[in-house]
UniProtKB/Swiss-Prot annotation:
Modified residues (Phosphoserine): 124
Result when mutating residue 40 to Q: Impaired endosome penetration and reduces infectivity
Induction: Expressed in the late phase of the viral replicative cycle.
Highest taxon of the lineage: Viruses
Protein name listed in UniProt: Pre-protein VI
Site features described as Cleavage, chain residue numbers: 33-34, 239-240
Gene Ontology CC annotations of this record: host cell; host cell cytoplasm; host cell nucleus; viral capsid; viral procapsid
Short motif Nuclear localization signal, span: 131-135, 245-248
HAMAP family in UniProt: ADV_CAP6
Entry comment on modification after translation: Ubiquitinated by Nedd4 following partial capsid disassembly; which might play a role in intracellular virus movement during entry.
Residues covered by region (Binds to importin alpha/beta, involved in hexon nuclear import): 240-250
Organism: Human adenovirus C serotype 5
Annotated region described as Disordered, given as residue ranges: 103-148
Length: 250
């Protein structure tokens, strides 16, 4: 298999591709340059030496000499030492006080925790000794519900089942007279099925043209494939609206 140069696929700036060798990563060839610790340290030393030079010049000048004499007269150095000593002693005293308070809090006995007394239920004297009055005798309540008579009882008594109408009222039958319903005989509801009559069947004879068309088979709608695929595509989708250009001279 042939070696493929993938650099040809990278974007180019003129004739130079952006994708170069990997050995350039981390060096000064990158955009912005590499970070150098040596240059940073040399810059710091240069700044320190410059400050030292200006300070020594100011200290050795006449103004610096007068300032030193004034500080000696006011005993400035002794005051600074006394202030530092007092500050350190104050911090030590505060630390000693905190430690002593911790020790005293641990040595002192803890005060006993007082438990709250249990709640006492109070009973009012008025409600004490009262009892529910006991009845002398038990009373039983009996309720009677008037229900309609059963079907057998209604037939035995010969009672009408509906409310009688005054103009259509008739005498009530006796107690032992049977009650019957005189119904007309059932009508013959079954009907004979009606059969349809014979219908004439029309026979049509195919024409000769239809027979020839059936013998020749279905026509093919697909165009004949040619050697050029563009002509085949044009025969499928069409060429659109045909336009005719004519030049006329007036």
């Amino acid at each position: 298999m042939e070696d493929i140069n993938f650099a040809s696929l990278a974007p180019r700036h003129g004739s130079r591709p952006f994708m170069g060798n990997w050995q350039d990563i981390g060096t000064s060839n990158m955009s912005g340059g590499a970070f150098s610790w040596g240059s940073l340290w040399s810059g710091i030393k240069n700044f320190g030496s410059t400050v030292k030079n200006y300070g020594s010049k100011a200290w050795n000048s006449s103004t610096g000499q007068m300032l030193r004499d004034k500080l000696k007269e006011q005993n400035f150095q002794q005051k600074v030492v006394d202030g530092l000593a007092s500050g350190i002693s104050g911090v030590v005293d505060l630390a000693n006080q905190a430690v002593q308070n911790k020790i005293n809090s641990k040595l002192d006995p803890r005060p006993p925790v007082e438990e709250p007394p249990p709640a006492v239920e109070t009973v009012s004297p008025e409600g004490r000794g009262e009892k529910r009055p006991r009845p002398d005798r038990e009373e039983t309540l009996v309720t009677q519900i008037d229900e309609p008579p059963s079907y057998e009882e209604a037939l035995k008594q010969g009672l009408p089942t509906t409310r009688p109408i005054a103009p259509m009222a008739t005498g009530v039958l006796g107690q032992h007279t049977p009650v019957t319903l005189d119904l007309p005989p059932p009508a013959d509801t079954q009907q004979k099925p009606v059969l349809p009559g014979p219908t004439a069947v029309v026979v049509t004879r195919p024409s000769r043209a239809s027979l020839r068309r059936a013998a020749s088979g279905p026509r093919s709608l697909r165009p004949v494939a040619s050697g050029n695929w563009q002509s085949t595509l044009n025969s499928i989708v069409g060429l659109g609206v045909q336009s005719l250009k004519r030049r006329r001279c007036f």
